[in-house]
């Protein structure tokens, strides 16, 4: 591959080629795009890699017939610069399969080409997928999504088999037998039993949840993709994975913006800092996602 900026300038010689030493890199330096490490336990534990499908892998399963690895996760579009260009479309929820059948699928095909959806269509989206499990025949895969509070059923290649099934707040864990799917709703502390034939919840078992009310209420603002995005598929946690980070850099400036004066005293009682805050510049430049853990009082 080549290292090209968004103006079409090729920097490969300076990144990985003969001039790489100028930036402290060895010739041949590269960034790997490995989504999964595949360990062959029948062949001296040899390790191979598959990738190129997504930025963050959030769940993995193995197809019961072919042995193909299948992953679910998030593909982020951080290569697109500037907030007005992105217009809120900065990530996609995906399923990828490698091996005998290779495919990469957008699990929300109804969102393609649009920046906003009415509530009824938004409810069909899945966001922040966390668990995937195949049926014993391999014809179905069930996907539990933490941000959209639902379960989606797809075929072996990731194509939807109907609309998502609402199951509970924070759907994180999943297990199947031939008759039902068991879904752990982490945020509300319940286990939902879903009838696989009827595609609806048949029973809910409450679990003990010691988390304080303040944390439970805050989870909706952090994770809920239907509540806080125009297409129903992203939330704060799309980039701040589990309140941490996606380890990506984003250039979210606004070339058409203006300086925003900050008229407060920011020296915190230290004269060397000066009396004023620096004004906010509309061009932030590339900035890496920061963790939100220990944000208050630490």
Give the residues covered by each predicted segment.
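Periplasmic c-type cytochrome electron-transfer domains
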Residues: 4-28, 32-35, 39, 43-298
């Amino acid at each position: 591959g080549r290292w090209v900026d968004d103006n079409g300038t090729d920097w490969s010689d300076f990144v990985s080629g003969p001039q790489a030493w100028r930036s402290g890199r060895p010739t041949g330096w590269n960034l790997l795009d490995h989504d999964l490490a595949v360990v062959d336990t029948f062949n001296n534990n040899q390790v191979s890699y598959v990738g190129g499908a997504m930025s963050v892998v959030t769940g993995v399963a193995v197809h019961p017939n072919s042995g193909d690895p299948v992953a679910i996760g998030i593909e982020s579009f951080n290569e697109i610069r500037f907030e007005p260009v992105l217009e809120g479309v900065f990530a996609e929820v995906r399923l990828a399969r490698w091996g005998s059948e290779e495919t990469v699928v957008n699990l929300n095909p109804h969102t393609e080409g649009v920046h906003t959806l009415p509530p009824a269509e938004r409810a069909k989206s899945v966001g922040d997928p966390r668990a995937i499990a195949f049926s014993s025949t391999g014809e179905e895969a069930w996907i539990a999504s933490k941000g959209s509070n639902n379960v989606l059923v797809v075929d072996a290649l990731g194509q939807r088999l109907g609309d998502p099934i609402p199951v509970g707040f924070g759907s994180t864990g999943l297990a199947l037998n031939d008759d039902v799917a068991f879904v752990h709703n982490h945020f509300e502390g319940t286990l939902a039993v879903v009838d696989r034939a009827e595609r609806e919840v048949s029973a809910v078992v409450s679990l003990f949840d010691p988390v304080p009310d303040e944390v439970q209420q805050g989870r909706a603002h952090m994770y809920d993709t239907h509540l806080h995005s125009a297409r129903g598929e992203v939330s704060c946690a799309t980039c701040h994975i589990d309140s941490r980070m996606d380890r990506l850099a984003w250039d979210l400036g606004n070339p058409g913006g203006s300086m925003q004066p900050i008229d407060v005293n920011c020296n915190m009682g230290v004269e060397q800092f000066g009396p004023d805050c620096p004004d906010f510049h509309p061009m932030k430049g590339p900035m890496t996602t920061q963790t939100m853990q220990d944000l208050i009082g630490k």
